């Protein structure tokens, strides 16, 4: 029913194979005929023909081996020295770059630390006095009831930046109690966003 297995098929010889087989058979017949006529001479000729290519192959192999052994010795020393110098110079450049970057980072961090220490000592006092005044005014606007203060500790958290307090910024918004400085964004302010502006007059 099914197709025959293609693996079990014996391959038919191609035309070239047929020609080669015919030539081999002819050579065998000729050699047998010659051997029957003059067996001693034929044996000597066959041995000589077999020995000659073997000797030639051995000589060629020996020459190749000798050439391969001589090749590594012929590499000029100048090329080796140049390659090692390139490697050293590349490594030295890489190390110098690393040292520079590390020293730059270290010096910048030192500058930053020194500057931050100065800022902390000098400006902390001014910020604390200005901020306490602002916090006192904010707490007056939104002071919790007496009962709530017992249960909750009051923290004054303003969504706006309190670092820039100048004379014009000390005017507080009626909507959220934040300072109306340059950094006050009413769209980003959590308190300003929740206030309904439909009833309030426009602020100038």
Swiss-Prot record:
Residues 9-53 have a biased composition (Basic and acidic residues). It is a lipid-anchor. Residues 2-29 are annotated as: Targets GAP45 to the cell membrane. Phosphorylated at multiple sites. Phosphorylation increases during the schizont stage and peaks in segmented merozoites. May be phosphorylated by PKB. In schizonts, phosphorylated at Ser-89 and Ser-149 in response to phospholipase C-mediated calcium release. Phosphorylation at Ser-149 begins in early schizonts while phosphorylation at Ser-103 begins in late schizonts. Phosphorylation at Ser-89, Ser-103 and Ser-149 appears to be dispensable for GAP45 inner membrane complex localization or GAP45 inclusion in the glideosome complex. It is found in: Inner membrane complex. A lipid is attached at residue 2 (N-myristoyl glycine). Residues 1-86 are annotated as: Disordered. GO terms for cellular component: extrinsic component of membrane; glideosome; host cell membrane; inner membrane pellicle complex. Component of the glideosome complex, an inner membrane complex structure involved in parasite gliding motility and host cell invasion. During the asexual blood stage, required in schizonts to recruit MTIP and MyoA to the inner membrane complex where they assemble with GAP50 to form the glideosome complex. By regulating the formation of the glideosome, plays an essential role during merozoite invasion of host erythrocytes. Component of the glideosome complex composed of GAP50, GAP45, MTIP and MyoA; the complex is formed during the late schizont stage and in merozoites. MyoA, MTIP and GAP45 probably form an initial complex in the cytoplasm which is then recruited to the outer face of the inner membrane complex via the interaction with GAP50. Interacts with GAP50; the interaction is independent of GAP45 phosphorylation status and can also occur independently of the formation of the glideosome complex. This is Glideosome-associated protein 45.
């Amino acid at each position: 029913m099914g197709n025959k297995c293609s693996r079990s098929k014996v391959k038919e010889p191609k035309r070239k194979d047929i020609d080669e087989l015919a030539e081999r058979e002819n050579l065998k017949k000729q050699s047998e005929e010659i051997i029957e006529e003059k067996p001693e001479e034929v044996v000597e000729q066959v041995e000589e023909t077999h020995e000659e290519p073997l000797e030639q192959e051995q000589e060629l192999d020996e020459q190749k081996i000798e050439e391969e052994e001589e090749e590594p010795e012929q590499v000029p020393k100048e090329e080796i020295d140049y390659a090692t110098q390139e490697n050293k110079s590349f490594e030295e450049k890489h190390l110098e770059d690393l040292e520079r970057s590390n020293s730059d980072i270290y010096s910048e961090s030192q500058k930053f630390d020194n500057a931050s220490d100065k800022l902390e000592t000098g400006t902390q006092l001014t910020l604390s006095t200005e901020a306490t005044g602002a916090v006192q005014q904010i707490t007056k606007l939104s002071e919790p009831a007496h009962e709530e203060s017992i249960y909750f500790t009051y923290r004054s958290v303003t969504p706006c930046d309190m670092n820039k307090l100048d004379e014009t910024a000390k005017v507080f918004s009626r909507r959220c109690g934040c300072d109306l400085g340059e950094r006050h964004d009413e769209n980003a302010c959590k308190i300003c966003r929740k206030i309904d502006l439909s009833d309030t007059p426009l602020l100038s």
